[in-house]
């Protein structure tokens, strides 16, 4: 396992990291009301009487929110508690009309689970590692204070108030920023696969509270700080890096780390004190008297389990075992829902176009999907109209390349034209002269002329200077304006040079 350490003035320090990820549940309505959850509405346009805590309004649990949380728990191999209960978390803040948040402290919906992060040498993770997940509980989100609408007043937008959140609490099992980043990316992928959260950190539908402490290797856990509402993977890693170094500097200078809540400033890459960290007793939790306990029937659990898709780990293993892809390609292709969906669509189209089974074309399609196509799209910038790059058109390009009709470079040129203008790839190849020459007569004539003009190099090659073979290939390709089929060129040269 990779070993990440902070090098302090007095020796090495180990970082201990736990994450509490708040994921907005994919649902058309809020957790306890029928108000819409659509993002971007006018302030206070999506607030029911329940959300506004009007007297006499009683909460009614949204079955879909519970279903999505259960499916998420199943996706991380967690214990699903068939009996759970809602509690009131009491505190006063302007964006919380009830004066309490409905959450689950004592009896959460989902118990212990786990999540696997894969080895990634580039990221500094040398081995696969299992991260424990302590629990998932369901709770209400709060509203939002708006401080930039008036010079002397703050406004309250309650559109978000009452939206269902899953709080996914990890064990303090991570030991580096890289592991934490990998954990958040993997968790986001699972949520997107399942469809229980869109994982959009920019819009706030997924955010992390980052708990960091430091200790000497092998010692007890140190005092932790919690940095709230971090909304990108990169920022999560920056928070850990900064906090760990800040705590080490503080301890080594004779100070002590205080248990506190902090805020992250993306502009400076630093954290600052927000308030002292509260404990559970500070919130005076007690069971919500307006809500009955949740009791889940076996038929409901069976329905949830049956609705789960193939998950990232299973898909990655299938890509390696059944399609013969490398571990790297399998991991990259399964990292995001959109990536694997595009790959599988293109794989099916290419196998059909070429007339082979998917395994035989999988590596070619994977390399195209991960490297070639994104590179061309990026190079074109605004000129690329990705809607032109249908799976059928890309499959037609790959079919010509597989048949030796076009080279890799010509495939890129044809794809550029498709992105800019659309059109049939085979027609483009014919009209633009973007096809390889496989005519042995024409290639042989060019090679004969090159060998005749380089008799000294021919002799050197025959005397053991094998590297000159590349020279002859290059000269032939130059003479054929880069359009000669490399396989045909190689074979004719081997036959003639002996």
Curated annotation (Swiss-Prot):
Secreted is among the record's keywords: no
Keyword Electron transport listed: no
Keyword annotations from UniProtKB, A to Z: ATP-binding, Ligase, Nucleotide-binding, Protein biosynthesis
SMART domains named among the record's database cross-references: GatB_Yqey
Reactions this protein catalyses: L-glutamyl-tRNA(Gln) + L-glutamine + ATP + H2O = L-glutaminyl-tRNA(Gln) + L-glutamate + ADP + phosphate + H(+); L-aspartyl-tRNA(Asn) + L-glutamine + ATP + H2O = L-asparaginyl-tRNA(Asn) + L-glutamate + ADP + phosphate + 2 H(+)
EC number(s) recorded for this UniProt protein: 6.3.5.-
GO molecular function per UniProt: asparaginyl-tRNA synthase (glutamine-hydrolyzing) activity; ATP binding; glutaminyl-tRNA synthase (glutamine-hydrolyzing) activity
GO biological process, one term: glutaminyl-tRNAGln biosynthesis via transamidation
Enzyme class label: ligase
Self-association state and partner proteins as the record states: Heterotrimer of A, B and C subunits.
UniProt family annotation: Belongs to the GatB/GatE family. GatB subfamily.
Record's function text: Allows the formation of correctly charged Asn-tRNA(Asn) or Gln-tRNA(Gln) through the transamidation of misacylated Asp-tRNA(Asn) or Glu-tRNA(Gln) in organisms which lack either or both of asparaginyl-tRNA or glutaminyl-tRNA synthetases. The reaction takes place in the presence of glutamine and ATP through an activated phospho-Asp-tRNA(Asn) or phospho-Glu-tRNA(Gln).
NCBIfam families: gatB, PRK05477.1-2, PRK05477.1-4, PRK05477.1-5
Protein name (Swiss-Prot/TrEMBL): Aspartyl/glutamyl-tRNA(Asn/Gln) amidotransferase subunit B
């Amino acid at each position: 396992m990779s070993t990440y350490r902070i090098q302090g003035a007095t020796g090495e320090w180990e970082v201990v990291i736990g994450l509490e990820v708040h994921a907005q549940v994919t649902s058309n309505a809020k957790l306890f009301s029928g108000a819409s959850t659509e993002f971007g509405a006018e302030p206070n346009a999506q607030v029911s009487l329940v959300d506004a805590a009007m007297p006499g309004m009683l909460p009614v649990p949204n079955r879909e929110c519970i279903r999505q949380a259960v499916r998420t728990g199943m996706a991380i191999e967690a214990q699903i508690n068939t009996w759970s209960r809602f509690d009131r978390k009491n505190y006063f803040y302007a964006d919380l009309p009830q004066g309490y948040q409905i959450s689950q402290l004592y009896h959460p919906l989902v118990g212990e689970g786990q999540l696997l992060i894969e080895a990634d040498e580039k990221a500094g993770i040398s081995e696969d590692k299992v991260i424990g997940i302590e629990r998932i509980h369901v709770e209400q989100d709060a509203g939002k204070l708006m401080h930039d609408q008036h010079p002397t007043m703050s406004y309250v937008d309650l559109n978000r108030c009452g939206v269902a959140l899953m709080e996914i609490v990890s064990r303090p099992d991570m030991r580096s920023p890289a592991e934490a980043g990998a954990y958040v990316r993997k968790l986001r992928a699972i949520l997107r696969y399942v469809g229980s959260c869109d994982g959009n950190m920019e819009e706030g539908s997924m955010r992390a509270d980052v708990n960091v402490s430091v200790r000497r290797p092998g010692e007890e856990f140190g005092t932790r700080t919690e940095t709230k509402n971090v909304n990108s993977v990169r920022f999560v890693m920056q928070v850990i890096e900064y906090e760990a170094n800040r705590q080490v500097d503080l301890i080594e200078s004779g100070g002590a780390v205080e248990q506190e809540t902090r805020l992250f400033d993306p502009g400076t890459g630093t954290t600052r004190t927000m308030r002292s960290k509260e404990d559970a007793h500070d919130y005076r939790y007690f069971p919500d008297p307006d809500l009955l306990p949740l009791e889940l029937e076996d038929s409901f659990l069976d329905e949830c389990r049956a609705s789960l898709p193939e998950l990232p780990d299973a898909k990655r293993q299938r890509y390696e075992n059944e399609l013969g892809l490398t571990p790297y390609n399998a991991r990259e292709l399964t990292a995001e829902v959109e990536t694997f969906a595009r790959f599988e669509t293109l794989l099916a189209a290419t196998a059909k176009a070429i007339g082979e089974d998917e395994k035989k074309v999988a590596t070619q399609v994977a390399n195209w999907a991960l490297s070639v196509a994104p590179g061309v799209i990026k190079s074109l910038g605004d000129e690329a109209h990705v809607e032109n790059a249908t799976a059928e058109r890309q499959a037609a390009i790959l079919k010509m390349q597989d048949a030796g009709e076009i080279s890799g470079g010509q495939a890129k040129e044809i794809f550029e034209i498709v992105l800019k203008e659309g059109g049939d790839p085979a027609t483009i190849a014919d009209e633009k002269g973007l096809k390889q020459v496989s005519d042995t007569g024409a290639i042989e004539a060019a090679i004969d002329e090159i060998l005749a003009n380089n008799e000294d190099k021919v002799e050197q090659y025959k005397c053991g200077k094998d590297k000159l073979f590349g020279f002859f290939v290059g000269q032939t390709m130059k003479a054929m304006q880069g359009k000669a089929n490399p396989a045909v060129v190689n074979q004719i040269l081997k036959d003639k040079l002996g």
